[in-house]
């Protein structure tokens, strides 16, 4: 057991999907995994291990924001030996070419957070995805016919930002979307020498405000990113 995860050693696979919403973790376990067993209910942050196409895979919620995903991802890596971590979550488009329900693969993650600068105050340490996972995910998504964008995202500490126009400006610099976790996940992956990737479904748009989705859709649909994430985890 770790401080925030109740699993015993061996109950978590070395490959894991990380949705922010614990109910999305439950949905993935019930709809994609065979013989799924719940290994964590602490703070209702549900975690499950089962098999996908014969491969042992886990899924666990992380909550919202970089402090929360940092807690769970670090414990999964350090205490349970997880080697491949793929975040599957939602993001808001910052680019007019990126639309609701399309996928974004975060090649890198800019951030307004101090989560990295606390460790490296004199450097701008780049948060980048595992190229192996990114390459596999991109080709899998294309083979499945999914509209997929690859590029930089913004990982923000603030959901209700007072810097809305600044965020919009980033879209003009090629930033695809804004979310709240990828930079912290990539930083931990670099620190502990594991592979990480963030796959997001666009749930709303900051540049096309008429495009949006419901809370129920965000919890129970967006299955394309789940399929891509699982296929990427088991790809040789």
From Swiss-Prot:
Binding-site positions, a purine D-ribonucleoside: 4, 179-181, 203-204
Record has Glycosyltransferase as a keyword: yes
Catalytic machinery residues: 204
Chemical reaction(s) catalysed: a purine D-ribonucleoside + phosphate = a purine nucleobase + alpha-D-ribose 1-phosphate; a purine 2'-deoxy-D-ribonucleoside + phosphate = a purine nucleobase + 2-deoxy-alpha-D-ribose 1-phosphate
PROSITE patterns registered for this protein in UniProt: PNP_UDP_1 (PS01232)
EC id: 2.4.2.1
Enzyme class: transferase
Main function: Catalyzes the reversible phosphorolytic breakdown of the N-glycosidic bond in the beta-(deoxy)ribonucleoside molecules, with the formation of the corresponding free purine bases and pentose-1-phosphate.
Subunit and partners: Homohexamer; trimer of homodimers.
Protein name: Purine nucleoside phosphorylase DeoD-type
Gene that encodes it: deoD
């Amino acid at each position: 057991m770790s401080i925030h995860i109740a699993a015993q050693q061996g109950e978590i696979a070395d490959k894991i999907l990380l949705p922010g919403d614990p109910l999305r973790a439950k949905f993935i376990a019930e709809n994609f995994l065979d013989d799924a067993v719940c290994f964590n209910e602490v703070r209702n942050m549900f975690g499950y291990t089962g098999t996908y196409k014969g491969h042992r895979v886990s899924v666990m919620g992380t909550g919202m924001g970089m402090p929360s995903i940092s807690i769970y991802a670090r414990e999964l890596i350090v205490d349970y030996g997880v080697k491949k971590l793929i975040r599957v979550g939602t993001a808001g488009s910052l680019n007019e070419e990126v639309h609701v329900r399309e996928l974004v693969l975060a090649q890198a993650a800019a951030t307004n957070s101090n989560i990295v600068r606390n460790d490296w105050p004199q450097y701008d340490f780049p948060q980048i995805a595992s190229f192996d996972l990114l390459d596999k995910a991109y080709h899998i998504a294309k083979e499945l016919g999914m509209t997929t964008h690859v590029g930089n995202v913004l990982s923000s500490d603030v959901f209700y930002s007072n810097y809305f126009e600044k965020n919009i400006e980033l879209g003009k610099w090629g930033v695809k979307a804004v979310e709240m976790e990828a930079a912290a996940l990539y930083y931990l992956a670099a620190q502990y020498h594991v592979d990480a990737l963030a796959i997001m479904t666009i749930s709303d748009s900051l540049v096309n405000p008429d495009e949006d989705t419901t809370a129920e859709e965000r919890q129970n649909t967006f299955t394309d990113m789940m399929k891509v994430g699982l296929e990427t985890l088991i790809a040789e």
